[in-house]
């Protein structure tokens, strides 16, 4: 298994935290699933807690596929996107990517 830098671990913690905050403080619902056996995770943001099958953002990331600096950039982009949903500055649109 790949060793993850401290900076990237912190970004992962922030991503988990912001998913929790999205669920607590917005009308959206966020899902964060970690799969330790493949060192990957899946994040989804859905339109509302009642309409939790209507995805507006989805990202799947396998950390072993990236060098440390590339992983940092990917995690930073995810965090920035999630912050947009938390702050209400993201428009409701489907943005689905998979790596």
Where are these regions (language model features)?
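Negatively charged, low-complexity tracts enriched in Asp/Glu with abundant Ser/Thr
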Residues: 1-40, 49-99
């Amino acid at each position: 298994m790949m060793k993850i830098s401290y900076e990237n671990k912190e970004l992962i913690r922030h991503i988990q935290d912001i998913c929790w905050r999205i669920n607590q403080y917005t009308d959206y619902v966020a899902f964060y699933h970690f799969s330790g056996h493949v060192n990957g995770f899946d994040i989804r943001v859905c339109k509302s807690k009642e309409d939790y099958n209507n995805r507006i953002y989805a990202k799947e990331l396998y950390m072993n596929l990236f060098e440390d600096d590339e992983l940092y950039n990917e995690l930073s982009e995810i965090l920035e996107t999630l912050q947009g949903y938390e702050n209400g500055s993201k428009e409701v649109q489907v943005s689905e990517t998979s790596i």
